[in-house]
Amino acid sequence: MAKSDSFFIRSSIEPDNLGTFVQSSIDLGAYVDALGKSVLRIHNIAVTFSDSLGNAAQLQAASDSGAVQFQLTTQSQSDTVTAANRAVIASGIVYAQNSFSSDEFPLLSHDMDNLPQLWTNGYLIAVDQIYLGGEASTGWVAAENMTISLVMECTVETMSTAAAMALALSQQ
């Protein structure tokens, strides 16, 4: 497979801190054309959970807790799905707890999901849109919604038309 130099695709969503699933599409039409034998390989994904300004998020007082999660999929979703769903490219969950009596930066754990994403040979994409979805629970300081941002390191590669179409059909 011939491939390009690596480049970066960025996206973000702002869940409402009420546990409501939100989703945004990421247009890959400039990179992916299965009939033209062009596919995208995602090599790495870096994810940030922050407030809308990129600052560290705080949890509310009184020993509150919270969670924020994301998923990157090849198909549109109406809610969070498990990693067993064939549309899932990547996902992650962060759990947090504030044990103080004032709004503070929380103790964090990400032991329940595969954040960060590590692949030996990357993840091939042959669809022209992928979807970043996520949600955040109550407990985060209400002044700012959580922001889930991701940066993907990618290359464009060529495949045979038959292989690219088969991959595209498997991801729809």
Regions found by a protein language model. Name each.
Residues 1-31, 104-113, 119-125:
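Low-complexity, Ser/Thr/Pro-rich intrinsically disordered segments found in N-terminal tails, propeptides
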Residues 73-125:
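Extended, solvent-exposed segments with strong compositional bias
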Residues 24-78, 85, 149-153:
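Beta-rich globular "head" domains
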Residues 1-19, 34-37, 140-172:
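C-terminal interaction-tip segments
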Residues 37-47, 121-142:
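Noncatalytic modules at the cell exterior or secretory-pathway interfaces
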